[in-house]
Amino acid sequence: MGSTKCYLLKGRLELGVSGGPMSVVRKLRHYLVLPVIPAHRKAFTSILFSTHGLAVERLRWRERYRAPVPREWRLCRFCRASVEDEVHALIDCEGDISHPLVPLREAMRREVSAIVPDFVWHSDSLSLLLCLLHDRQLPVPVAKFIYDVLAVFSSVPMYVPAPFLYTPLLQTQA
């Protein structure tokens, strides 16, 4: 199986000179020259390049006294119902009823709809996130939204499952 890092960048297309979509490997991307707060730009690029502090990345690392945690056990610190990855954190996680993620998403949705009234709100979470990240009209509100969501996640300790949950028991040969 290949690496799951940077999957938000794989297969992306840019508008070519002729106006049609084409794959461009080397190009100054629109989100790198934003007139935006540097912390928002860093949050935006951390999602694209998988350098954020969500469990899907942090728990892949070996740390002192802890082996890497298998991906399926890198659960969300709020709901523990799904892997805490970019799509779950930014689009899917509901947390609990008093959680700030839902109002943040609603505010971002209103802002995006004001900028791009005919924006297509995909039912597929990954498609929606890809559209939000790569739309050239939306990087400022999306970068702020990503920054705010990552701040919410960093304010709560990460869920680290006990190793016995995902480590097979040693079989003793008699």
Regions found by a protein language model. Give the residues of each.
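Family-specific functional microsites
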Residues: 5-174
